[in-house]
Amino acid sequence: PLSINVAAVLSRAFDGKLPISYSGGASKFNISDIFETGIRPITMATDLLKPGGYLRQIECLKEIDASDSWGMSQVDVAKLEALAAKALTMDYTQKEWKSEDRIEVGGGLPLTDCYVAPCVTACAVHQDIPEYIRLMGEGEYVAALELIYQRNALPAITGHICDHQCQYNCTRLDYDSPLNIRELKKVALERGWEGYKARWHKPAGSGDKHPVAVIGAGPAGLSAGYFLARAGHPVTLFEREADAGGVVKHIIPEFRIPAELIQHDIDFVAAHGVKFEFGCDPALTVDKLHAQGFTYVFVGIGADKNGGMRLEGGHDRVYKSFHFLRSFNQGKPLPLGRHVAVIGAGNTAMDCARAALKVPGVSDVTVIYRRSEKEMPAYREEYLEAVEDGVRFCFLTNPERFDKDGKLTVRMMALGDPDEQGRRRPVPTEQTEVMQMDALITAIGEQPDCEVLKAMGIPLGSDGWPEVDSQSGETSRRNVFLIGDVQSGPSSIVGAIGGARRAVDLVLAREHIASQQRDVATQPSGKDEIYRRKGSIAVTLVDKNERDAFVAQEAHRCLECNYLCSKCVDVCPNRANVAIAVPGFKDQFQTLHLDAYCNECGNCAQFCPWQGKPYQDKVTIFSLPEDFDNSRNPGFYLADGGELRVRQDGETYRLTIDAQSRIKDAPAALGDMCRIISHEIGRAHV
């Protein structure tokens, strides 16, 4: 907006007769509009340093080539002023248009075979996202749904209320906007269910498989039952409520997910042969279940203990979040009055605030949070939905007193040093304020009830918490597992599914049963097609309700980055990173770094999803011996006479390579490095 408005001011002053060379934010989004004003030439720089930047020049040139404005001899001031005004409000010029999320895989950058789909690694169940999106784009909805069911027991539920970490880590964020992956999952179920159900067969149970008891029929318990039954285990779910669904059914408001979709997933779990016992004995213990013949016991009772808040003043309308939400879902909302405060800023607080606004008689709801908006734990989407509904937010405030006359005294806070989770600590100030409230809902401090676990027979450590393996969820009592929020603390639905899956995998390993998760063997799109997608920007997105067009658009936008990435190659201004095809590796290409071309600008590291720097971590070709000596990069230098100097993992080796590009006496640890070296040197000698 700044550059185009400067151009407008100058053109107005010179009546359009001042020749202007434009450089400052020209991109696929506006280059045609800029050209139509008569500005010549238009130069682009920043966009070239982004993934797909060079490839996008083709689209830009096509747009300009089709223009009728080639004959303009001066700037059209009216058009330019209109464009300048438009630039101030266009979506792509607004700060919120570009997500602040950084695509991250976690872990160091591998020397070879680094192609990865960040959406998959971010997903708690490692859903095969690029594969099922490709199948949907081909119209294979049944196959796509079958693929989803391999890792996800509850696609109807997660199609609505998944926290979609996949979208926050979609590679498209570096191009335009992330794929709407959660909505695609919903479409896969809508269009694939009837065909999938027609060819689905109930798993055949086996008399030699040990029975499993699952306490709790929430998302974690349902998922454990699904995966265990699919492998042939007899499973019984014990639930204290009158029906299954847990927090999704009884706590999350129905305006977020229709009840029939929750029931869809429950019914399909039951169709696998899982038995349900509702209204079970609250005093059910592990010992009692063992006595009934259950070899394995899974405990998925959630984290619904809420300590509430201790406030002076004695007001009697102070409710705990789960109590309020349960009453709301039953159609029996608690008395709130007109003005309601919700304490906390997590996802449960957002549900409470939005639900409270729908209670008859409530005129306004205010969320009170002791940190700033940046530190709030609620998912961004849920926060924005609350804002859209009209929920007010008071950040950096903490309640201290709630008097019977409705006066709520809050202390203003400031942010101090970061805590162990990286969020800045709230520090009290001397300033207080008074608000007028009729009711207060506390949505803080949900945690597992360790006393209940102890009564069940779950061993607790000296700190009062269960002794549990963080990966499998197995307690110090063999074959007894904690799954879902009771193991991890308050988390997401898909996190509960993933935790249940890991626990089931350990049981299957002990039972010598092959995992039900099979590697996906689908044919990826060709590299030429994927490169075309890299050069394509979605200026406008199709409405998700136009299902055919929506699926086609998103399938075309998917970059299939586990089959082809090379972002570090795309964004290097000096072309110091190159992709070469080397036989014998998983990925189509391996990345080589050319030391002589690199000025260490770090642009490749900026866009790499790994916690690494391609210009330092990839196999590096050195042109001079002194460059090799002055670097720590893994790589090689080939001297005259076939002497080969190689460095890997900080160790330097002196080897020789013959005329057939065979490296002699190379240690086994250098296998991948030597394969690349032999291929490159052999190619150079052809």
Predicted segment positions?
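Ferredoxin-like iron-sulfur electron-transfer modules
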Residues: S99-A122, A143-H164, Y196-A213, K249-H250, ...
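Glycine-rich dinucleotide-binding loop and its adjacent helix/turn
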Residues: L189-G205, H264-G279, N306-P360, S462-Q471, ...
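FAD-site-proximal beta/loop scaffold in flavoenzymes
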Residues: D316-G337, E420-P490
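A conserved FAD-binding loop/helix module that cradles the flavin
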Residues: I483-E511
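Conserved small/polar residues in nucleotide/adenosyl-binding loops
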Residues: A684-V686
